[in-house]
Design a protein with these regions (language model features):
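Residues that define the transmembrane beta-barrel architecture of outer-membrane proteins
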Residues: 11-15, 63-67, 109-113, 145-149, ...
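Residues on the lipid-exposed face of transmembrane beta-strands in outer-membrane beta-barrel proteins
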Residues: 17-21, 71-75, 85, 115-119, ...
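Short, P/G- and charge-enriched loop/turn segments at secondary-structure junctions
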Residues: 2-6, 18, 59, 103, ...
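C-terminal beta-signal and adjacent terminal beta-strands/loops
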Residues: 39, 135, 154-203
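Outer-membrane beta-barrel translocator domains and adjoining extracellular loop/strand segments
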Residues: 1, 41-50, 90, 94-102, ...
Length: 203
């Protein structure tokens, strides 16, 4: 990664609108929409656009438009268990002043999903959830979609002290969240199955 001393600050406008409601004691719904227009938007760029393995730097995109929406729902099964899910759609377009106008940024998967089940009782918290995406451009991704599972477990020892264990990508899926393919493999792959154990103290 190489720095860029000529980097300019982003300027622009962002609009958001949303609505959250609780239908009853068990169901919560939410929907949000957003739109932004930025000048000198900051993004990563390969020094050699034809070689994703070349050095990268942060650079200003002339103009960027981003629009999208998110829908989420939570359903309380019992006092201890609940399920939740969300869907996010995002579209990013950029104009690099190359005479071609705005073009879609295909490094971003347009459809993103999350669904999980949570357990909360006394000092215990646990969550198992799946994360996925679809609609990715196969010129930038090995596969247009992916799905992976994560697990977290937490125990509150005291008011300000807790211990936790987390497992990521339980399915050991091969996937990426940022576009880039070289010789049929992801240039920026996400980690395979991994585990984390830790503690947290608040003061």
């Amino acid at each position: 990664m190489i720095g860029n001393a000529k980097l300019k600050p982003e300027t622009g406008e962002v609009w958001t609108i949303g609505y959250d409601t609780k239908l009853n004691d068990k169901i919560q719904l939410g929907i949000n929409a957003f739109y932004s227009e930025l000048d000198d938007a900051i993004n990563w760029a390969a020094l050699d656009p034809n070689n994703f393995l070349s050095d990268w730097t942060v650079a200003n995109v002339a103009k960027q438009k981003k629009r999208g929406m998110e829908f989420n729902v939570k359903y309380k099964l019992t006092d201890e268990f609940s399920i939740n899910g969300s869907y996010t759609y995002v579209k990013v377009e950029e104009d690099n002043k190359d005479g071609n106008g705005f073009k879609r940024n295909t490094n971003v998967s347009p459809n993103q999903y999350k669904i999980g089940i949570s357990f909360n009782k006394d000092k215990w918290d646990a969550e198992l959830y799946g994360r996925g995406a679809s609609g990715a451009d196969k010129s930038k991704y090995v596969d247009s979609k992916y799905l992976t599972l994560d697990l977290s477990l937490q125990y509150k020892v005291q008011k300000d002290y807790k211990i936790y264990a987390k497992a990521y990508n339980l399915t050991n899926a091969s996937y990426a969240e940022t576009g880039g393919v070289s010789n049929g493999k992801y240039s920026f792959p996400m980690p395979g199955r991994s585990f984390l154990i830790g503690m947290e103290y608040a003061f």
